[in-house]
Design a protein with these regions (language model features):
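Generic structural hydrophobic/aromatic packing signal, biased to beta-strands
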Residues: 1, 72, 97, 119, ...
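Short, conserved active-site entrance elements at the starts or edges of catalytic domains
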Residues: 35-81
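Short, structured beta-strand-loop surface elements
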Residues: 23, 102-181
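Short secondary-structure boundary/capping segments
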Residues: 61-62, 87, 165-166
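Hydrophobic membrane-insertion alpha-helices, especially the h-region
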Residues: 16-36
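Short beta-strand segments
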Residues: 66-102, 120, 127-131
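Short secondary-structure boundary micro-motifs
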Residues: 8, 55-57, 69-72, 101-103, ...
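N-terminal Lys/Arg-rich, disordered targeting/topogenic segments
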Residues: 1-14
Length: 181
C-alpha cells in the first residue's frame, strides 16, 4: 500500500520539476528577445538585430556615411552577438568596419574569412559577408574614409573626432563588408 501512495507523489514531483524547467527556459528566451530588442547599447553588446529587411543587395554603401554608428550581428557559436561600431564608405561606395585595438575585441576573434553577418543601419537590416583587410592600400582607403566620416559624426568619449591628418595606427583593423542575397 505504501508503494501505491509513493507513485502519485513521485509523478507530481516530476511534473512540477518539468513545468519549472520549461518556465525557466521560456523566461530565458523571452528575456533574451527583449534584451535583443534593446541592445546593443553604447558599449554593451546585444543579441539579434531586428529591423526592416533590406529590399535587396547593396552595391553602393555611400548612405552608411549618413548614419553615426552601424550595428553588426555575428554568431559566437550558436549565440547571436551584436555590437555598435563605426562603419564607413569609401568614395567608391565600398563599406568597411573600423576596429581599434582589435586583438582584444571579442567579436573580431570570431570573424573568419567570408563570415556571414547582419548589419543594421538606420533600422534596416542587411545580410552581409565580412572579410578582414590586411593590404595596406585598402586599409589606408578605409582609414581615410573613417577620418572623413568622423569629422561629421565624431565626438564624445568613445568616438572622438580624429585629426584630419591622423595616421593609421598599427592596432587598427578593418573589415570589408559586401552584400549577400
Amino acid at each position: 500500500m505504501s508503494e501505491s501512495v509513493a507513485e502519485p507523489h513521485t509523478s507530481n514531483h516530476k511534473w512540477i520539476i518539468g513545468v519549472s524547467l520549461a518556465s525557466a527556459l521560456a523566461a530565458g528566451i523571452v528575456g533574451f528577445l527583449i534584451y535583443s530588442a534593446v541592445c546593443p547599447c553604447e558599449r554593451t553588446p546585444g543579441g539579434f538585430l531586428f529591423g526592416a529587411a533590406a529590399d535587396g543587395p547593396v552595391d553602393d554603401w555611400s548612405f552608411a556615411n549618413e548614419v553615426p554608428l552601424c550595428q553588426l550581428q555575428i554568431y559566437a557559436g550558436i549565440r547571436p552577438h551584436s555590437i555598435n561600431l563605426n562603419c564607413m564608405s569609401t568614395p567608391a561606395g565600398e563599406l568597411y568596419l573600423s576596429c581599434s585595438v582589435c586583438e582584444q575585441k571579442y567579436w573580431a576573434a570570431r570573424v573568419d574569412a567570408n563570415e556571414h553577418a547582419v548589419m543594421r543601419l538606420d533600422g534596416v537590416t542587411y545580410p552581409v559577408v565580412l572579410n578582414r583587410v590586411e593590404e595596406a592600400t585598402r586599409m589606408d582607403a578605409a582609414w581615410n574614409a573613417r577620418i572623413t566620416k568622423l569629422q561629421s559624426f565624431g565626438g564624445g568619449p568613445y568616438n572622438p573626432t580624429p585629426d584630419p591628418n591622423a595616421r593609421r595606427p598599427d592596432h587598427w583593423w578593418t573589415f570589408h563588408v559586401t552584400s549577400r542575397s
